[in-house]
Regions:
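Active-site glycine-centered loops adjacent to acidic/histidine catalytic or metal-binding residues
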Residues: 12, 109, 230
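A structural signal for isolated positions on well-ordered beta-strands in alpha/beta enzyme cores
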Residues: 5-7, 51-53, 77, 104, ...
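Short beta->alpha linker loops
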Residues: 30, 58-59, 83, 223, ...
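Conserved beta-strand termini and adjacent loop/short-helix elements that scaffold enzyme active sites
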Residues: 55-57, 79-82, 136-138, 163-166, ...
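Catalytic-core segments of class I nucleotidyltransferases/pyrophosphorylases
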Residues: 121, 125, 157-241
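N-terminal glycine-rich phosphate-binding loop and ensuing alpha1 helix
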Residues: 1-63
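Conserved beta-loop-beta/alpha segment of the NTase-like Rossmann-fold superfamily
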Residues: 63, 68-155
Length: 241
């Protein structure tokens, strides 16, 4: 199995929570902070099989200190987000020089759960042997939820037919939203350009999904996904601890 590079975009300002420290190190319990959930997905994987790349800004260097606890377990590197780049797409683009051949983006302020016994690393590597891109998605049909997510339209074989970030029209054609995505290094530029034009609402798209490896790539269904970017969601999780 090739080494998998895990990109964690953690350069957001976290204005919804207004914490005095990076939201990624918000404690969920005595042992774990939010960002630990991303590392837990690779627990037991040897150092030579996974590398972590964390994208930060100058106000979030506390993350570097917090993640030092993994220094004997994993290769971890940090890079600043290019100030000329914006949104999560800009954070990921800022880490391009650190990509491996096989890569996965995880959002470090979320909790992603896979079916019991499923290895994220093995599943992603298997998909990237066949496809250049793969969304990890959660099925969803609620209109209000879809309006806040990066939405996908999948066929009966979980292949991607359409994508739009936070759609306002034709919402009911979508049947899920992405929670993470994996890609081959060589496919990155086309895929991120397509996704970014939707995220930034640049108007008439210059790049169609059919022109990218995203089109008809097979997606991976997750068991559950929680975005902890709001106090409402955090309170729900803390009440279950």
């Amino acid at each position: 199995m090739n080494k998998l590079t895990v990109i964690l975009p953690a350069a957001g300002k976290g204005t919804r929570l207004n914490l005095p420290y990076p939201k990624e190190i918000l404690r969920l319990n005595k042992e774990k902070a939010l960002i630990d959930s991303s590392f837990d997905l690779f627990d037991g994987l040897p150092r030579n099989k996974v590398k972590f790349v964390v994208v930060i800004n100058e106000e979030k260097t506390e993350i570097v200190k917090y993640l030092a606890k993994y220094k004997s377990q994993y290769d971890i590197c940090f890079t600043y987000q290019n100030p000329d780049e914006i949104e999560y797409t800009g954070a990921i683009k800022s880490a391009k020089h650190l990509f491996g051949e096989n890569n996965i983006v995880l959002l470090p302020d979320t909790l992603l759960t896979l079916p019991k016994g499923v290895s994220l690393a093995q599943t992603v590597q298997h998909h990237l042997n066949k496809y250049e891109f793969a969304f990890l998605f959660k099925p969803e049909t609620d209109k209000q939820m879809l309006m806040t997510k990066g939405c996908v339209q999948l066929d009966e074989n979980m292949r991607v037919l359409a994508y739009e970030d936070k759609p306002s029209d034709n919402i009911f054609k979508f049947n899920g939203y992405w929670c993470s995505f994996a890609f081959k290094k060589g496919a990155f530029d086309e895929c991120i350009a397509f996704m970014e034009q939707s995220t930034l609402k640049l108007g008439q798209p210059k790049l169609l999904i059919e022109q990218t490896p995203i089109f008809k790539s097979k997606s991976i269904e997750v068991e559950d996904f929680k975005d902890l970017g709001t106090w409402e969601e955090i309170t729900k999780i803390l009440s279950q601890s």
